[in-house]
């Protein structure tokens, strides 16, 4: 029996896995998330997702003398409009990001990586969703940033929380904007013999 491991401390990703009924444990990775290789956004999120998953796969692979089989899920999300935006560094950075996104379309990219500790077979993929932000007044931006909600989110907003009122429309997977594209993840899990709709 394979055991699912989520290589992420994101509460949103945990909630999404619970939503589709997966049993899993959380093991955090210790990787550097900087873009030292100057990769394009779609490459970067897959690269970081893989690094997270690989780091955690190495940690859990030797449990029980390697008798247990683990399927490690790594993910990384960025927002892209002219540049790559991760989580804001501070309050001012969050304000700058929201002003940059105001009144325009941007892309949310989530890279996913799965690694099977049995043979370290891996697969990576990326999901892209387009999001149109409303025209935001300075007062709205400052009030939203003051909620502290943006500080741990790529692009400085959370579509599943108060940030929902900032969004005009989206094209593509909503769950991708939250942090984990569930349809794409389900397809990847099938490649490793795991069905969301059937008990493992």
Swiss-Prot record:
Reaction catalyzed: dTTP + H2O = dTMP + diphosphate + H(+); UTP + H2O = UMP + diphosphate + H(+)
Site for Important for substrate specificity, residues: 12, 77, 160
Any one GO cellular component localisation term in the record: cytoplasm
First-level EC class: hydrolase
Keyword Cytoplasm: yes
Entry cofactors: a divalent metal cation
Keyword check for Nuclease: no
Active-site feature positions: 76 (proton acceptor)
Pfam families per record: Maf (PF02545)
EC number from the UniProt entry: 3.6.1.9
Major localization listed first in the record, in broad terms: cytoplasm
Family annotation (InterPro entries): ITPase-like_fam, Maf-like
Keywords: Cytoplasm, Hydrolase, Nucleotide metabolism
Molecular function GO labels: dTTP diphosphatase activity; UTP diphosphatase activity
Subcellular location: Cytoplasm
Task performed by this protein: Nucleoside triphosphate pyrophosphatase that hydrolyzes dTTP and UTP. May have a dual role in cell division arrest and in preventing the incorporation of modified nucleotides into cellular nucleic acids.
The family this protein is said to belong to: Belongs to the Maf family. YhdE subfamily.
Protein name (database record): dTTP/UTP pyrophosphatase
Organism of derivation: Acetivibrio thermocellus (strain ATCC 27405 / DSM 1237 / JCM 9322 / NBRC 103400 / NCIMB 10682 / NRRL B-4536 / VPI 7372) (Clostridium thermocellum)
């Amino acid at each position: 029996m394979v055991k699912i491991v989520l290589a992420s401390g994101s509460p949103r990703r945990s909630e999404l896995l619970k939503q589709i009924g997966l049993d899993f444990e959380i093991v955090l990775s210790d990787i550097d998330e900087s873009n030292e290789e100057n990769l394009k956004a779609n490459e970067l999120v897959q690269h970081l997702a893989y690094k997270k998953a690989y780091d955690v796969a190495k940690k859990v692979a030797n449990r029980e003398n390697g008798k247990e089989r683990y399927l490690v899920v790594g993910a990384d999300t960025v927002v892209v409009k002219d540049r790559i935006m991760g989580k804001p560094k501070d309050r001012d950075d969050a304000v700058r990001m929201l002003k940059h996104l105001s009144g325009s379309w941007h892309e949310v990219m989530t890279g996913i990586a799965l690694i099977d500790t049995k043979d370290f077979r891996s697969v990576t993929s990326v999901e892209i969703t387009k999001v149109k932000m409303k025209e935001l007044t300075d007062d709205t931006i400052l009030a939203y940033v003051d909620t502290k909600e943006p500080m741990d989110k790529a692009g400085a907003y959370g579509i599943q929380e108060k940030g929902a009122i900032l969004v005009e429309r989206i094209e593509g997977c909503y769950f991708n904007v939250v942090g984990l594209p569930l349809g794409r993840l389900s397809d990847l899990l099938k490649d490793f013999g795991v069905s969301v709709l059937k008990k493992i």
